[in-house]
Amino acid sequence: MPMKTPEYESVNPLATEQLILQFPFFVMFTFLIPLYYMVSKLAEEKEGKSREGMKMMGLKDSSYFLSWFIFHLILMIIMAGLITAMCSINLFPNSNKLLIFLHMFFFGLSLFGFSLVVVSILPTVRSSATAATLVHLITYFLMFALKDPASPQGLKLSLSIFPNVAMAFGLYNLYDFEAN
C-alpha cells in the first residue's frame, strides 16, 4: 500500500521564484569587489602620475588603454562564465547559456565604463573607490521603487543608464520568459 505523501519535486517553484527575486542582489555583490579593485587601481595610477611617466618612456596612449581594457575583459569573461555556469544548473535551465553569459559579460563591461567615469570625476583613490561602491549599492536599491507596476516606463528607461538597474531588469525579463 503506497504512503499518502505528495510526490517529490526536485525544484520547488516557490523557492526558485524567491531566488530570482534576490538574484540581482547577489550578482550586484559579486561584482562589487572587482568594481572596487578597478576604481582603486585606476585612481591610483591617475594619482601617482604613472601614465605620464610611461608616456615619457615611449608608451603610446592606445597601448596603455588597451592593456587596461584587455585585463578587465579577461576578468569579466571569467566572472561571466562562472555566473553562467551557476545559473544554468537550476535557475535558468531552459534559457540559452550564451544569452546569460552575454548579459553578465556586458554588465561587467558597463561597470568598467562606470569605473572610468567615477575615476575621471573624483581626484583621490579613497574618494573615488568609496563613491563608486556607494553609487553601485544605491543604484541597486532604486530597483525597489521601479518594481512597482505604476512607475512610468520613461523613468525605468532613463534609470537603466545605471548598470545595476539595467542588469536587474534584464534578469527579471529573463525569468519571465523562463517561466512562460
Q: For the regions a protein language model found, what residue spans apply to each?
A:
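Short cytoplasmic-facing helical segments at TM-TM junctions of multi-pass membrane proteins
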Residues: 49-56
